[in-house]
């Protein structure tokens, strides 16, 4: 059976994913599925760099604003809804474009990972809650060492600061009995062309810093306060970068400048982790639209046409 064709656009913040996705969607009758774990939440717009209503009017967008802040939206939910959307979009003879940077979500969709049923998702959530409670009482290093005892190979590849990934590795082992490091990706579910956008590290970091300043000017602090006031009932949604860093400021424990600097630092670290994950986990074709826009845009268009004709 012939596989459905999809294009995936990945990369850290500030490298041109949105602009490229809109251009490709216009040229190829595409519909865009957000692959970002935080953009599913209503009202979290600025901190998640959500596409604007004007941008959404250019091409159909999906999996944006589909959950309230107090709802859980898991990789299982994304996988199920994403697969259904790909089938519907393909049936309309349009091209699905997956745009975003949440590694586990993309992997679950592209490789058809077995994530279990809704009941299993509930079990995952209880295990996740257990380790998050552990983290509140212990250090990141303690959490990482708990993983290292069970799965040293996974721990060697996951930095202690990436607590979400560490907890996910612990979840996988406790749920399935299979070590996270021994999970082998299956064959790609779709006929997939993956575009990775990046630029030189100093340029990327400067763009991230500028992006954070622009978000602050656009009202990020007010949005973070809105999330802060709902943090007790929204543990998953308020963990996103761009929100949690302001909580100490709201509590009077640090200055606004320090909170903004922390957002910038965490955003830079996250971008570095994203790039490492993309290089190691999925077959990406890399381009630089920041420093080589004209040449690489032409190369992208040529490579897409070659792939479409296969």
Curated annotation (Swiss-Prot):
Q: Which PANTHER family match?
A: TRNA DIMETHYLALLYLTRANSFERASE (PTHR11088:SF60)
Q: How does it assemble?
A: Monomer.
Q: Which SUPFAM superfamilies match?
A: P-loop containing nucleoside triphosphate hydrolases
Which reaction(s) does the protein catalyse, per the Swiss-Prot or TrEMBL entry? Answer: adenosine(37) in tRNA + dimethylallyl diphosphate = N(6)-dimethylallyladenosine(37) in tRNA + diphosphate
Q: Which GO terms describe its biological process?
A: tRNA modification
Needs which cofactor? Mg(2+)
Gene name of this polypeptide: miaA
The positions annotated for binding ATP are 11-18
Name used for this protein in its record: tRNA dimethylallyltransferase
Which organism encodes this protein? Answer: Latilactobacillus sakei subsp. sakei (strain 23K) (Lactobacillus sakei subsp. sakei)
């Amino acid at each position: 059976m012939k596989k459905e064709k999809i294009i995936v656009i990945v990369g850290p913040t500030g490298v041109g994913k949105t602009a490229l996705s809109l251009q490709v969607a216009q040229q190829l009758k595409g519909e865009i599925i957000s692959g970002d774990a935080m953009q599913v939440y209503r009202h979290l717009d600025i901190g998640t760099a959500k596409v604007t209503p004007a941008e959404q009017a250019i091409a159909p967008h999906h999996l944006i604003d589909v959950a309230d802040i107090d709802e859980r939206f898991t990789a299982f939910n994304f996988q199920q809804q994403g697969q259904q959307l790909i089938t519907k979009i393909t049936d309309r003879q349009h091209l699905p474009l997956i745009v975003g940077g949440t590694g586990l979500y993309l992997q679950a969709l592209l490789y058809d990972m077995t994530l279990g049923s809704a009941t299993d998702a509930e079990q995952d959530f209880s295990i996740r809650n257990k380790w998050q409670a552990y983290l509140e009482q212990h250090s990141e290093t303690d959490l990482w060492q708990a993983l290292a005892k069970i799965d040293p190979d996974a721990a060697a590849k996951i930095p202690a600061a990436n607590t979400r990934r560490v907890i996910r590795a612990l979840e996988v082992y406790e749920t399935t009995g299979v070590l996270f490091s021994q999970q082998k990706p299956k064959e790609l579910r779709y006929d997939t062309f993956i575009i990775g956008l990046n630029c030189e590290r100093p340029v990327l970091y400067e763009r991230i810093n500028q992006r954070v300043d622009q978000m602050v000017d656009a009202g990020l602090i007010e949005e973070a306060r809105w999330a802060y006031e709902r943090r007790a009932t929204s543990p998953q949604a308020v963990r996103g970068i761009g929100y949690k860093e302001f909580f100490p400021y709201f509590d009077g424990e640090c200055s606004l400048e320090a909170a903004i600097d922390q957002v910038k630092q965490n955003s830079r670290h996250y971008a570095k982790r994203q790039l490492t994950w993309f290089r190691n986990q999925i077959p990406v074709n890399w381009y630089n639209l920041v420093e080589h826009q004209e040449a690489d845009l032409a190369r992208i268009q040529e490579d897409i046409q070659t792939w479409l004709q296969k």
